[in-house]
A protein has these predicted regions:
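Bacterial N-terminal signal peptides that target proteins for export
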Residues: 1-9
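Extracytoplasmic thiol/disulfide redox context detector
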Residues: 2, 21-164, 183, 198-222, ...
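Bacterial N-terminal signal peptides
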Residues: 8-16
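Short Fe-S-cluster ligation motifs
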Residues: 162-174
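Short acidic-hydrophobic, aromatic-tinged amphipathic segments that line or gate anion-handling sites
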Residues: 171, 237-238
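Short, internal strand/loop/helix patches
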Residues: 173-197, 201-202
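Catalytic His-Asp charge-relay segment
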Residues: 224-226
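Structural signal for short hydrophobic segments within the conserved structured cores
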Residues: 233-235
Length: 253
């Protein structure tokens, strides 16, 4: 499973970047910015240093300006007990805003609801109609969904077989997409779902946008599952989870 921190850095932090660009950074920090880093904020640091959070080459990076303001040190800072003093500031200034942006992008994507709209927990997954592991996760999630505790949102794509996109289009085009998805998944290998012969332009645009988002996140397979942990942090699971991970993703039964 890819590192979530790596995943989060794949999307542009447009708002934070715009705000950061308005700052007049010290000369050494400007030099790092000139090399392609985005300076996203400043934080307190020990020993007379001043910390700066940056995004560089799809990674969060900590910068430390020396007390005289003439030099900058790049990298994580550790105390005498081996505690990483850079992790928390990077989480707050870099990774947390990126996680929020990813969640917002998934909210705006085209998905099929699976479960109660008032369910307290929402889980997104990129799903292909021909994906056996998507079907496995659908089955795994039934106790939570039927109890009204979880709403799955299936971001439909077409990557596994030649007819995958046409089948996703058929689900989107159904009079009741939620019911059509339930019928398809409940049938498993016996599904009678037929792909559309011709995909309407509006549905094709939805599928294209979903695929673009999947590519932005550098996801290679389905299901790619996104959920929030007990602290509200964004987490990802690639593939159908092991049974012992279900509670982390779906919450208590």
């Amino acid at each position: 499973m890819p590192s979530l921190r790596h995943l989060l850095t794949l999307l542009p932090l447009t708002l934070a970047a715009a705000l950061a660009q308005a700052e007049d950074w010290p000369a050494p920090i400007k030099q790092i910015e000139a090399k392609g880093a985005r300076i996203l904020g400043k934080f307190d640091a020990p020993s007379g240093l001043t910390g700066y959070a940056a995004q560089y080459q799809n990674r969060g990076m900590a910068l430390y300006l020396t007390a005289d303001g003439n030099s900058v040190i790049a990298g994580n800072l550790y105390d005498a007990q081996g505690n990483d003093l850079s992790s928390a500031p990077l989480d707050k200034l870099v990774y947390a805003p990126m996680a929020k942006e990813i969640w917002a992008k998934m909210e705006k994507s085209s998905w099929i609801q699976d479960g109660d709209t008032n369910a307290p927990r929402i889980v997104y997954l990129f799903s292909d109609p021909n994906c056996p592991y998507c079907n496995m996760f659908w089955e795994q999630a039934r106790p939570w969904v039927k109890a009204g505790k979880v709403q799955l949102r299936h971001i439909m794509v077409g990557i596994i077989r030649e007819d995958s996109a046409a089948k996703s289009a058929a689900l989107f085009a159904a009079k009741d997409p939620q019911k059509a998805l339930e019928t398809h998944e409940a049938a498993g290998k016996g599904s009678k779902l037929q792909g559309l012969d011709k995909i309407p332009a509006d549905i094709e645009a939805k599928l294209d946008a979903n695929m673009k988002l999947m590519e932005e996140l550098e996801l290679r397979a389905t299901p790619a599952i996104f959920y929030r942990d007990d602290k509200g942090g964004l987490q990802q699971q690639q593939g159908a989870p092991a049974p012992d991970k279900l509670v982390k993703i779906l919450g208590p039964k």
